[in-house]
């Protein structure tokens, strides 16, 4: 089974994946798999450009794939980690990104971009709001979904997170200026 651990940068994917690996799960990053299968196209502004369609066609991995593109690999299950954009902004500020890149990611989170893409590419999709959860709580939620726990799968079904409604009077703070 291919499980995507995905979400906007800063939602906790790498931290969760690292701990899951320590607990014995088979975990790889999208970049590791892209390197293995020769699917890295280029590098732009310090970011690796991956031929995701080619990787999805070539992937032979069973386990958890971590990365904000992992949901595009046609996984059996996609677990989308989410975070309130107001909190996410603070998490991302330490990355020394340009204001444009910061806002691009906040906008993507606000508009459910990764969730919508996951719904298009994965057989099953779950979303976890990591905003006020400890790392251990997020890991427990992810493990429950992986185990097939019915309560967890019901609790984390997609559609329960709506940043636009929650932050409606602050939307402009998180959107790029046109």
Curated annotation (Swiss-Prot):
Gene3D superfamilies xref list: P-loop containing nucleotide triphosphate hydrolases
Keyword Secreted on entry: no
UniProt xrefs under PANTHER family: ADENYLATE KINASE ISOENZYME 6, POS9-ACTIVATING FACTOR FAP7-RELATED
Subunit organization: Interacts with uS11. Not a structural component of 40S pre-ribosomes, but transiently interacts with them by binding to uS11.
Region of interest (NMP), ranges: 29-50
Pfam families named in the record: AAA_18
Species of origin: Archaeoglobus fulgidus (strain ATCC 49558 / DSM 4304 / JCM 9628 / NBRC 100126 / VC-16)
Protein name per Swiss-Prot or TrEMBL: Putative adenylate kinase
Keyword terms of this UniProt record: ATP-binding, Kinase, Nucleotide-binding, Ribosome biogenesis, rRNA processing, Transferase
Homology family: Belongs to the adenylate kinase family. AK6 subfamily.
């Amino acid at each position: 089974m291919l499980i995507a651990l995905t979400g906007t940068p800063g939602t906790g994917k790498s931290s969760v994946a690292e701990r899951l690996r320590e607990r014995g799960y088979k975990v790889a990053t999208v970049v590791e798999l892209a390197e293995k299968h020769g699917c890295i196209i280029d590098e732009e502004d310090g970011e690796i450009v991956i031929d995701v369609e080619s990787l999805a066609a070539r992937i032979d991995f069973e386990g958890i794939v971590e990365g904000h593109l992992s949901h595009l690999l046609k996984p059996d299950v996609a677990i989308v980690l989410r975070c309130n954009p107001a909190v996410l902004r603070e998490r991302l500020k330490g990355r020394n990104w340009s204001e444009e890149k910061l806002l691009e990611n906040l906008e993507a989170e606000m508009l459910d971009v990764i969730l919508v893409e996951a719904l298009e590419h994965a057989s099953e999709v779950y979303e976890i709001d990591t905003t006020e959860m400890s790392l251990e709580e997020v890991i427990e939620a992810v493990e429950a979904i992986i185990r097939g726990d019915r309560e967890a799968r019901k609790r984390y079904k997609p559609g329960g997170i709506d940043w636009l409604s929650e932050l409606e009077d602050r939307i402009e703070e998180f959107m790029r200026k046109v």
